[in-house]
């Protein structure tokens, strides 16, 4: 972590951070109005959130991650660009659904390039598993979207199988259906690495039934 990132976590956290208590989070509680609310899980360096927030200032965005240097970098960018519609939650994503968000409170959930844990003995560490997807689906509004991207074909197939087993989610195929510019993503470091290695970029779009 750089000195600037460390200082951002200290100085800018009251402005952009969300406390790790057990209070439920809503758009009106965070932003003071009923704006649409999008949650990005694993925001990395935060560039995707910055780009979305700048393009759509009337939307509300929350980034969830445990990587503190990335949070510090994101807060520096938010402060420099005077962005007011992004908040950061430093918490394990597996703990936020139903603990921090109520049912039918989120318009969109974005999960871009989650760790595929390619070794079979590590598959249990993957975040996108049935219980996680069920709790996530409960927190989506009716007809809300779950948007996932990965460059791991095996992980993609596993995710699709989990979605097929979840009655609250409908897989939209082809995956670009409904992918309006509001949620077209910024190419992340991990996506760029996948492209450089010749991996296909696989998009999944599911909707709350």
Positions of predicted regions on the chain:
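S-adenosyl-L-methionine
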Residues: 1-39, 47-54, 75-103
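Conserved beta-strand signature within the Rossmann-like core of class I S-adenosyl-L-methionine
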Residues: 142-150
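Class I S-adenosyl-L-methionine
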Residues: 158-161, 165-209
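Conserved SAM/SAH-binding beta-strand->alpha-helix loop
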Residues: 67
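Conserved glycine-rich SAM-binding loop
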Residues: 44
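A short glycine-rich, Lys/Arg-flanked "PGG" loop and its adjoining helix->strand segment in the class I
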Residues: 128-142
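Conserved beta-strand/loop positions that form the S-adenosyl-L-methionine
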Residues: 39-41, 64
């Amino acid at each position: 972590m750089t000195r600037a990132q460390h200082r951002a976590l200290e100085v800018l956290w009251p402005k952009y951070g969300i406390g790790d208590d057990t209070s439920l989070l809503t758009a009106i509680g965070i932003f003071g109005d009923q704006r649409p609310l999008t949650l990005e899980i694993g925001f990395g360096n935060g560039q995707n959130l910055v780009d979305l927030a700048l393009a759509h200032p009337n939307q509300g965005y929350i980034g969830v991650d445990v990587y503190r240097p990335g949070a510090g970098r994101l807060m520096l960018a938010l402060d420099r660009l005077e962005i007011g519609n992004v908040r950061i939650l430093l918490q394990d994503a597996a703990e936020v659904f139903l603990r921090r968000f109520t049912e039918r409170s989120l318009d969109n959930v974005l999960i871009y390039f989650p760790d595929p844990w390619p070794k079979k003995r590590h598959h249990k560490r993957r975040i996108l598993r049935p219980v996680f997807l069920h709790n996530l689906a409960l927190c989506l509004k009716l007809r809300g979207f779950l948007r996932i991207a990965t460059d791991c074909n095996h992980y993609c197939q596993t995710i699709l199988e989990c979605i097929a087993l979840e009655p609250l989610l409908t897989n939209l195929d082809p995956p670009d259906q409904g992918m309006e510019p509001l949620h077209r993503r910024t190419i992340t470091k991990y996506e760029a690495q996948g492209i450089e290695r010749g991996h296909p970029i696989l998009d999944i779009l599911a909707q709350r039934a």
